[in-house]
């Protein structure tokens, strides 16, 4: 049986310029898995803590102080890797080691196992499952916590090239729409300065409806059928709109409020009107 023979970590910077952690796991002295951990801009209160209170440095110190616990483990046995992590941190929300570090350890072990066995990564996770083509999701328009004042309340408008036959075509189609959306916004608003949110989506001064309309227009300008060749998605990030005292969703930029029932109708209308293939966090928590 193969064994983990080395584990290490380091502090790196993510695309927002914030510190995160990267973990290396080596199996049988040769097969390296390396993973850097993501973390979101808007998080829920039930979500695993990305890092302990003192940040990724505390995660890294805990990893290094407990690295010997992983040595000799089978990298293909994800349950055993998880169990080791839980001996280090038994808190409900990973507040000691951080969910980001736990994620990086688990996926680095899986990547190391895949290289060890010379199989694709997914074969380690699900060796006997049906294969389906994954559609990469691209962020084309940002609002909410990802962009500045005047942008939409909803956090992201995304696309998936659901008509693509290959990963190359899917990425190419996503990029085409991203570029066309900039052109479409510029024609609609000559004052647009090509501003972007922190994940690369364009950040125009539009309300929710206008942002969705112009995103759909950009898709159709390229000759694609909305909901067929290219589909829209929305990350509502509704917890950022939720007001606990009022028990309502406050859309301050658009100038309206939703009670919980109205919020469900609001999201359902967008899903139906724009033929969404993807909807994230449409309600609080």
Question: What role is predicted for each listed range?
Answer:
Residues 11, 21-29, 33-39, 138-161, ...:
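Short beta-strand elements
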Residues 38-119, 171:
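Metal- or metallocofactor-binding catalytic centers and their adjacent structured scaffolds
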Residues 131-197:
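Mobile "lid/hinge" segments at catalytic clefts and subdomain interfaces of large enzymes
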Residues 14-15, 90-107, 136-149, 197:
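Glycine/serine-rich anion-binding loops at beta->alpha junctions
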Residues 191, 209-285:
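Catalytic core of soluble alpha/beta enzymes
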Residues 1-20:
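Short, Gly/Pro- and small/polar-rich lid/capping loops
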Residues 136-141, 194-204, 228-234, 279-280:
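Hydrophobic faces of well-ordered beta-strands that scaffold small-molecule active sites
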């Amino acid at each position: 049986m193969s064994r983990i023979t080395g584990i290490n970590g380091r502090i790196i910077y993510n695309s927002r310029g914030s510190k995160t952690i990267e973990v290396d796991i080596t199996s049988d002295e040769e097969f390296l898995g390396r993973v850097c951990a993501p973390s979101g801009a808007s998080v829920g209160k039930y979500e695993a803590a990305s890092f302990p209170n003192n940040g990724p440095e505390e995660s890294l110190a805990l990893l290094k102080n407990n690295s010997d616990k992983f040595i000799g483990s089978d990298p293909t046995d994800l349950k055993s890797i998880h169990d080791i992590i839980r001996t280090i941190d038994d808190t409900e929300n990973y507040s000691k080691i951080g969910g980001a570090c736990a994620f990086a350890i688990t996926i680095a072990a899986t990547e190391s196992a895949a290289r060890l066995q010379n199989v694709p990564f997914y074969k380690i996770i699900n060796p006997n499952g049906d294969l389906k083509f994954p559609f990469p999701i691209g962020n084309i328009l940002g609002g909410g916590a990802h962009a500045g004042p005047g942008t939409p309340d909803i956090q992201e408008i995304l696309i998936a090239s659901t008509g693509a036959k290959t990963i190359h075509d899917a990425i190419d189609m996503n990029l085409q729409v991203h570029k066309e959306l900039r052109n479409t916004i510029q024609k609609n608003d000559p004052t647009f300065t090509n501003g972007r949110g922190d994940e690369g989506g364009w950040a125009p001064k539009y309300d929710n409806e206008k942002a969705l309309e112009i995103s759909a227009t950009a898709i159709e300008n390229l000759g694609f059928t909305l909901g067929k060749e290219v589909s829209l998605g929305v990350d509502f990030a509704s917890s950022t709109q939720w007001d606990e005292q009022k028990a309502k969703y406050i859309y301050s930029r658009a100038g309206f409020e939703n009670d919980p029932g109205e919020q469900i109708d609001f999201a359902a209308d967008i899903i139906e009107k724009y033929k969404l293939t993807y909807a994230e966090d449409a309600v609080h928590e």
